[in-house]
Amino acid sequence: MLKERTHHANDPEESGSIRISRVKTYKTVAGPLFLRSGCSPSFVEGLKADEGLRTFARLPEREHQLLLSIAQQPENKVTLAYDASGNIVGQVSLAPLDHWWQDIGNAYEIAVVVSSSWRKLGIAHHLLSFALEFESVEESLIVGLGFSWHWDYEELGMSRFRYREMIARLFAAHGFAEYLTSEPNIRMDPANILVARLGSHIDGESMNCFFQRLLQSETLPGL
């Protein structure tokens, strides 16, 4: 069950500017959670990472510092799920695409993480849905890059390919499709995956650039 309230929050990190945050309460069998979009660095700093949140940095404390560094960049968007004690149990981050994709306009990389202690409660779906409710989403290209070395599939008792299927289903439910690509990091493991959501009003130049980058190498895996 979700209940929503919307408010404006003053963000001291942005020299007097106002950052808009939305908050929803989410009731689970493990207890109530809060979903908050537009999280400021000061808000992130006031929380702590749940013990099961260790996907990218392997330790909750480092995961929290990584999340804080993402929130400190004004062009990034951070959406959190946290409990009444201030423990972060899930997060979605949106950051401008770089490196291989850096010349594509209005393009973001999305990352989704849920604590291993809070799985199978629908949190990832609710976080994704909430994070994608921003004004320019239909003018945006959003790409998810899934790398098997970040996944905790062994702890879940599954193969990395089954974990890959789980990721594909999660994103497909929110308008993403899987694309073959020659991007070097994706090609390092056949279990790796690239998904993308092309907004309904994305400009033609950005779309053409995206497909050109997918095919940038002469060798495209799977063909």
What are the residue ranges of the model-derived segments?
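Short, high-confidence coil segments that cap the C-terminus of an alpha-helix
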Residues: N76, V137-S140
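Well-ordered, non-membrane alpha-helical segments in soluble/globular domains
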Residues: P60-E63, H126-F130, R160-R169
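Terminal substrate-recognition subdomain of acyl/acetyltransferases
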Residues: M1-G46, S140-L223
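Conserved GNAT-fold acetyl-CoA-binding loop/helix
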Residues: S42-L66
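Conserved acetyl-CoA-binding loop-helix of GNAT-fold acetyltransferases
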Residues: V114, K120-S136
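A conserved beta-strand-loop-helix scaffold within acyl/acetyltransferase catalytic domains
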Residues: A57-Y108, V112
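Surface-exposed cleft-lining segments at the edges of enzyme active sites
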Residues: G52-L53, Y108, V113-W118, E154
